[in-house]
């Protein structure tokens, strides 16, 4: 990506997206592009409603996220009831600490059980299993700290609202 001005992402002869490297990384058009270009957590959801350029998306684990709707994207005309996915890059997730009771879940947060902690130098990768029927896993990258959770802890994380991106399944 460092040597390209524009990239075409294709799968089985079908063009999924054409654009600048940063655009494709930050705003993938499809779940395939999100997974193919860098690491991404792609979570299935259903649009519950829309208010202007923001859509409320309910994930399988019950979490409600609000995602910006880009009128120029393939999902620019997304409507309530539509099945979509959201792309969350590992670096766009913030660790909030121990998760409160499920009934106290704040909008825009995800809860998961820590399955992996990997020190990579200046950062740590943390793997989570979300509490949904699909066994969805999530990967996040945070700056190294002495205050890390332990494997088995149930934690809350919050995606940066500006970096929640809807993609076509």
Residue ranges and their predicted role:
Residues 40, 49-169:
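Non-catalytic connector elements of ABC transporters
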Residues 1-63:
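Internal alpha/beta loop-helix hairpins
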């Amino acid at each position: 990506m460092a040597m390209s001005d524009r990239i075409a992402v294709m799968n089985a002869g079908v063009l999924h997206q054409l654009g600048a490297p940063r655009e494709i990384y930050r705003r993938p058009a499809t779940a395939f592009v999100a997974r193919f270009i860098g690491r991404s957590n792609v979570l299935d959801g259903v649009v519950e409603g829309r208010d202007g350029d923001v859509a409320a998306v309910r994930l399988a684990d019950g979490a409600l996220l609000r995602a910006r709707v880009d009128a120029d994207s393939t999902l620019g005309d997304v409507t309530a009831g539509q099945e979509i996915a959201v792309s969350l890059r590992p670096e766009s997730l913030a660790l909030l600490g121990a998760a409160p009771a499920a009934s106290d879940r704040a909008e825009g947060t995800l809860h998961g059980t820590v399955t992996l902690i990997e020190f990579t130098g200046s950062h740590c990768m943390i793997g989570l299993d979300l509490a949904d029927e699909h066994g969805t896993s999530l990967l996040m990258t945070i700056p190294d700290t002495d205050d890390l959770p332990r494997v088995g802890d149930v934690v809350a994380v919050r995606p940066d609202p500006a970096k929640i991106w809807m993609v076509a399944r």
